[in-house]
Swiss-Prot record:
Region (Disordered): 1-88
Modified residues annotated as Phosphoserine in this record: 10, 202, 204
Residue ranges with Basic and acidic residues bias: 63-88
Record bears the keyword Phosphoprotein: yes
Provenance organism: Schizosaccharomyces pombe (strain 972 / ATCC 24843) (Fission yeast)
Coiled coil feature spans: 73-188
Any one biological process term the GO annotation gives: Golgi to plasma membrane protein transport
Keywords: Coiled coil, Cytoplasm, Phosphoprotein
Listed Polar residues bias regions: 1-13
Protein name as it appears in the record: GRIP and coiled-coil domain-containing protein C365.11
Domain GRIP: 216-264
Biased amino acid composition, Basic residues: 36-49
A Pfam family annotated for this UniProt entry: GRIP
Length: 266
């Protein structure tokens, strides 16, 4: 806006200078014209040269010459003043033209700076727009990743809950199995102490020593113990139902295997 206003002012100043210069040139042309008093003086000189016969007329001419010279002196003064005024006006106009030219150059420089700044601002705007678009894309990706992580966390939480429930069930089953093993061990110890162990010791000529059954576990059972239990199971038909659970523990037998053994022996 500032550059356009300054350019408009410079154009108006140029038009004003043109009009002023035209008026100055017209005034100078008017000054260069010879005044009418000089013509009158020439005519008077001609009349004077005609001779003394016209003395009365000559006297009148002298009076007219005196009055004309006075008038010409009076007129020459304002002409000189006008010349000075015109010279001063020309000087003022030249100074004004120079100032206007300087203002015009400054306005052009400001316009160039303004255009350059406008281009830079436009480029910065485009760069900011691209950055915003990239930021929006990044935000969308982060939202998707966040949703995926939340889904994964929910799935992991559900799996943990299921695993915890399964662990609880396994612990309960293990407790039940331990209790059943303890009950079977106690029954077997009573049977072995009363009937099975004495007979087995007599058959093996006193070489068999009963193991410590109270501390039996699946990991600590050895081959000798498993062999002795198997022999006792085969020899004692009456107590097979009680010996079979301990035998299945020693040999890691499933219920299917237990039923198969009982079926074949019976």
């Amino acid at each position: 806006m500032e550059t356009t206003v300054s350019a408009k002012n410079s154009l108006e100043n140029e038009n004003f200078l043109k009009e002023k210069s035209e008026t100055v040139f017209l005034d100078e042309a008017a000054i260069t014209k010879p005044p009418a008093s000089k013509k009158k003086r020439k005519n008077r000189k001609k009349k004077k040269n005609n001779g003394p016969s016209e003395q009365f007329v000559g006297n009148n001419d002298l009076e007219e010459q005196r009055s004309g010279s006075i008038d010409s002196k009076d007129k020459e003064k304002p002409l000189d003043e006008k010349v000075k005024e015109l010279e001063n006006a020309n000087k003022t106009l030249s100074d004004l033209v120079r100032r206007i030219q300087i203002q015009r150059d400054e306005a052009e420089q400001k316009a160039e700076i303004y255009n350059r700044d406008a281009l830079n601002t436009k480029q910065e705007h485009l760069d900011i727009k691209k950055r915003l678009e990239k930021s929006d894309e990044t935000v969308c990706k982060l939202k998707e990743e966040n949703e995926n992580l939340q889904d994964m966390l929910r799935n992991v939480g559900n799996e943990l809950v299921e695993s915890r429930d399964e662990i609880k069930e396994l612990i309960e089953k293990q407790k039940v199995q331990k209790e059943s093993v303890k009950s079977h061990e106690s029954e077997l110890s009573s049977v072995m102490s009363s009937e099975i162990l004495p007979k087995a010791s007599s058959d093996s000529a006193g070489s068999f020593e009963p193991p410590v059954i109270s501390n039996i576990s699946k990991e600590l059972i050895n081959k000798e113990y498993a062999r002795n239990v198997l022999l006792q199971f085969l020899e004692n038909h009456e107590h097979r139902d009680k010996i079979l659970p301990i035998l299945s523990t020693a040999l890691d037998l499933e219920e299917v295997h237990q039923h198969l053994i009982l079926k074949n022996l019976n």
